[in-house]
Swiss-Prot record:
GO terms for biological process: circadian rhythm; regulation of DNA-templated transcription. Keywords: Biological rhythms, DNA-binding, Nucleus, Transcription, Transcription regulation. This is Protein REVEILLE 7. The keyword Zinc does not apply. It is found in: Nucleus. Its main location: nucleus. It comes from Arabidopsis thaliana. GO terms for molecular function: DNA binding; DNA-binding transcription factor activity. Disruption phenotype: No effect on the regulation of core clock associated genes or on the hypocotyl length. Rve1, rve2 and rve7 triple mutant has no alteration in the period or phase of the clock. Residues 178-204 have a biased composition (Polar residues). GO terms for cellular component: nucleus. Residues 124-204 are annotated as: Disordered.
Length: 372
């Protein structure tokens, strides 16, 4: 309890002393402000007189700093009324030609004339709304001068597109085919024209290649209905067109036959079936199994076997009967048209090999009988 009472008494003493010091500082500040005001008025400043060393630092912080007087270092020349009148006359005569206005006035430089004109024009624009029309004559502000063209400008694209003349070969093709220049290809060969025998049989390069291969292989077949020549059908104008990077041959039919025979229709349908088979099985390593739709035998394993028999062995009636039965089975009928063609080819090859082994065994038996 005694400690607490002593602490409380000491704290009260500190507060009372702080109040006394604060009152003293306030009184001293009022006296200092009065002295400063009197010194500023009289032009004398005796700051060290009547100041205690304890309060000197505090007064230095609170002293109002006097701003340094502003001195104009740049001498701005004013425009007289005579110079301004000459300026207005020169603007009416020369517009924004500052060099000519400088010669007309004679006392101002071009830079000064330009700055004066900018200020004058802005002032005229502000006073244009408030000014009455009859009081003061309006001064016409000259339009700004056009910008100088650059001496060395950057290269720019020409506004007119460059039109390139088509090559002579292309123009010659246009006259013959009467087709637009943007789609025609610049190279057309006679081989592509002669590939197709009729417009119905080929319309692209893939079909034309298939047609040429069939024409070459038809020499080995024994067909009852020969193909028609190009001279019989008639020359048709053919134009080559590039679509998505591929060359397509388009044949324009000059005249179509009025009526088709039954044989021609069968031949055309069989050719379409053959082309579909060629397109599907071109990449197969086992080969192509073709149906005998054109009325002729194919170049498959059956015909090869028959040719080998004709060249090598003597004619045997039983073997030829078996081969003829196999050829009849491979003819064009709806049953054999469907199914997996390589599998059918394998079956036919097995039958042919079995028939060949039988023929060879018969020959050996006959030779043994003759030797005995």
């Amino acid at each position: 309890m005694l400690c607490f009472v002593r602490f409380q008494a000491g704290f009260v003493r500190i507060i009372v002393a702080a109040r006394k010091r604060f009152r003293y500082f306030l009184m001293a500040a009022e006296d200092r402000s009065e002295e400063l005001s009197s010194n500023v008025e009289n032009g004398s400043c005796n700051s060290n007189e009547g100041i205690n060393p304890e309060t000197s630092s505090h007064w230095i912080e609170n002293v109002v700093k006097v701003r340094k007087p502003y001195t104009v270092t740049k001498q701005r020349e004013k425009w007289s009324e005579e110079e301004h009148d000459r300026f207005l006359e020169a603007i009416k005569l020369y517009g924004r030609g500052w060099r000519q206005i400088q010669e007309h006035i004679g006392t101002k430089t071009a830079v000064q004339i330009r700055s004066h004109a900018q200020k004058f024009f802005s002032k005229m624009a502000q006073e244009a709304d408030s000014r009455s029309e009859g009081s003061v004559k309006a001064i016409v502000i000259p339009p700004p001068r056009p910008k100088r063209k650059p001496a060395h400008p950057y290269p720019r694209k020409s506004p007119v597109p460059y039109t390139q003349s088509p090559p002579p070969n292309l123009s010659a093709m246009e006259k013959g085919t009467k087709s637009p220049t943007s789609v025609l290809s610049s190279f057309g060969s006679e081989d592509q024209v002669n590939r197709c025998s009729s417009p119905n049989s080929c319309t692209s390069d893939i079909q034309s290649i298939g047609a040429t291969s069939i024409d070459k292989k038809n020499n080995y077949t024994t067909s009852k209905q020969p193909f028609k020549d190009d001279s019989d059908i008639g020359s048709t104008p053919i134009s080559s067109i590039t679509l998505f990077g591929k060359i397509v041959l388009v044949a324009e039919e000059s005249h179509k036959p009025s009526s088709y025979n039954d044989d021609d229709l069968k031949q055309m349908t069989c050719q379409e079936n053959h082309y579909s088979g060629m397109l599907v099985d071109t990449n197969l390593s086992l080969g192509v199994w073709e149906t005998f739709c054109t009325g002729s035998n194919a170049f498959g394993s059956v015909t090869e076997a028959s040719e080998n028999l004709e060249k090598s062995a003597e004619p045997i009636s039983s073997s030829w009967k078996r081969l003829s039965s196999l050829e009849k089975q491979g003819s064009c009928n709806p049953v054999n048209a469907s199914g997996f063609r390589p599998y059918k080819r394998c079956l036919s090859e097995r039958e042919v090999t079995s028939s060949l082994t039988l023929v060879a065994s018969d020959e050996k038996k006959s030779q043994r009988a003759r030797i005995c």
